[in-house]
Amino acid sequence: MRKLRKDTGKVVRAVCMQSALGVLVAFGAVRTQASTLPQEWKDALSVPAGYAFARHVEHVRTWDFPDFSVDFYRQANGPGTVQRVFVAVPKGGSGKLPAVAVPFYYPEAMLGFDPATGEELPKFKGVTMLADLARRGFVAATADAYHLTYRTDATEPRDDFKRWKKAAEALARDWRRWTGVGKLTADTRLLIDLLAADPRVDAARIGIIGHSLGGKMAFYAGCLDPRVKVIVTSDWGIDWDRTNWNDTWYWGAARVAAMKAAGRTHADLLAYAGGKPFMLIAGKYDNAASARAVLDGVPSCRDPERCVVLDHASGHRPPPDALEAGYRFLDKFLKPNSNNKETK
């Protein structure tokens, strides 16, 4: 138990470097311009007409810990639904602070413990990004994913994938043209709303990071939301064929097939992001080859300093040094006057 206390630019070049962390793959272009978003993406990701709800956020309570505090909010995330949000705030900060959204399955996971009870959650050891970032001086926010919020009558445990399936089926019945990944993206952008409105946050310095499911959410929301200035993702499947995009709670097999037939790839979203810094930490569901196959076509990857793939090739969960490289990438672009240097 824890004690509570647009497609222009020259051909992209790829540079591979061996490091102690694994293979670093960087992509760059001499010039860049934000693309328009292809219609297939708009159809799948745009919030459907009629999906309207009153925006509100309720502060529930605050927990205090040695290095940071955690504010607990309930935030409206759809017609008749709310998501729980944890915002971790570092101790000793002054002025307006940089902030990072940390999407994942549920908030406690990104802390590594339940702040209400002190119960440790060892399953998430090594990816407790919310706590890690607060200790680095960021305001960090995370929330429930929609499998926990869309069905208000759900009784399945939060880690039961039957709950994902039922939530996705309900979403598809209610909003036939939408996708699960569209809902995930919309809910993640609500975290950006909350951070941008927080008086403790410098709204010009907001980033996003995520692992696995959280990596998917971070990539989509980070590419689509201009308020996000830097994106870090970990092992989420940048190539259509390397992870479970066919599952109903993401795209569903028919929608993935249609996107592939139309020639759509995740390069479209990164091009639309217009050159904002992007880092992919690869390990199992991503690797250097799959990332290069997608990202070689992205003119908005300006240079090897701003568009980087680190392939640690050691499995799905990032080792500490790889995750530290991701944190330093955030530091580099959100704390320009700090002494942190990007891991090479």
Residue ranges and their predicted role:
Residues 1-14:
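N-terminal secretory signal peptides that target proteins for export/translocation
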Residues 16-28:
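Bacterial N-terminal signal peptides
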Residues 28, 32-34:
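Boundary at the C-terminal end of the N-terminal hydrophobic targeting segment
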Residues 53-93:
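N-terminal cap/lid segment of alpha/beta-hydrolase-fold proteins
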Residues 103-189, 242-245:
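Cap/lid segment of the alpha/beta-hydrolase catalytic domain
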Residues 186-261:
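Primarily recognizes the serine-hydrolase "nucleophile elbow" in alpha/beta-hydrolase
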Residues 240-298:
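The feature captures the conserved acid-bearing segment of alpha/beta-hydrolase catalytic domains
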Residues 302-344:
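C-terminal catalytic histidine-bearing segment of alpha/beta-hydrolase fold enzymes
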